[in-house]
């Protein structure tokens, strides 16, 4: 075990589903060990946070960092600092809302370049599935995107159009061959065409929502 250069002590440390008093040993910025609450080595700087909870960093897989192109909405600097302040140590950025979107290798590289030197935490990227980019899926996968996102209704931004069922099926086959994850904004407008309109007095009933 590496000797720690910092020890953080708490009465509530979360590890493998158990909450217990412990000391967290940190060496060169990396957690090196957990020991009993009273086992803080002498001469090592320590911080006692009382009963504040120490837990592994959270991962948020649905984040919209709109840089480049719409940084006034959110950029890597603000998004990752806010995440760190809330205990989130990894985010995965959605492929739309930036300009260009992450629907090909060029868009991904522009994202990576925009993130350079601005991230306070770890950042991963989703790729986008849009009409006409099926040949971009494999290169994006090989470049390291963690999966793909598509919309089945308009996304709200013109540069990230939705796919039809006819476009979705061959893309799903391609992604299956890659072992890649596909996320779908899962509304199918045509499936709702014959749904009877609810009576106004019923629309807020929870039982109706469940149906």
Predicted regions and their residues:
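Histidine-rich, glycine-flanked metal-binding segment
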Residues: 1-56
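Residue-level signal for inorganic ion chemistry
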Residues: 11, 29, 83, 87, ...
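Metal-associated gating/positioning segment near the N- to mid-region
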Residues: 52-118
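Hydrophobic faces of well-ordered beta-strands that scaffold small-molecule active sites
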Residues: 57-63, 91-92, 123-127, 148-150, ...
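Short, acidic/polar
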Residues: 72-80, 131-140
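Active-site gating loops and adjacent loop-to-helix segments of metal-dependent hydrolytic enzymes
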Residues: 85-104, 113-120, 151-154, 189-211
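Short, well-ordered coil/turn segments that N-cap beta-strands
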Residues: 88-89, 117-124, 144-146, 178-180
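Histidine/acidic residue-rich metal-binding segments in metalloenzymes
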Residues: 135-211
């Amino acid at each position: 075990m590496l000797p720690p250069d910092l020890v953080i002590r708490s009465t509530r440390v979360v590890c493998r589903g158990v909450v217990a008093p412990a000391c967290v040993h940190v060496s060169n910025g990396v957690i090196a060990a957990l020991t009993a609450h009273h086992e803080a080595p002498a001469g090592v700087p320590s911080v006692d946070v009382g009963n504040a909870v120490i837990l592994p960093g959270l991962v948020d897989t649905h984040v919209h960092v709109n840089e480049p192109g719409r940084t006034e909405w959110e950029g890597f600097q603000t998004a990752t600092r806010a995440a760190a302040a809330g205990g989130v140590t990894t985010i995965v950025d959605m492929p739309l809302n930036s300009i260009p979107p992450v629907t090909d290798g060029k868009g991904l590289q522009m994202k990576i370049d925009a993130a350079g030197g601005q991230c306070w935490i770890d950042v991963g990227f989703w790729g986008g599935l849009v009409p006409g980019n099926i040949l971009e899926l494999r290169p994006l996968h090989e470049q390291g995107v963690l999966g793909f996102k598509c919309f089945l209704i308009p996304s709200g931004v013109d540069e990230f159009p939705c796919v039809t069922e006819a476009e979705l099926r061959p893309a799903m086959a391609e992604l299956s061959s890659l072992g890649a994850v596909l996320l779908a904004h899962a509304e199918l407008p045509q499936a709702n065409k014959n749904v009877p309109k609810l009576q106004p007095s019923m629309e807020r009933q929870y039982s109706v929502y469940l149906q």
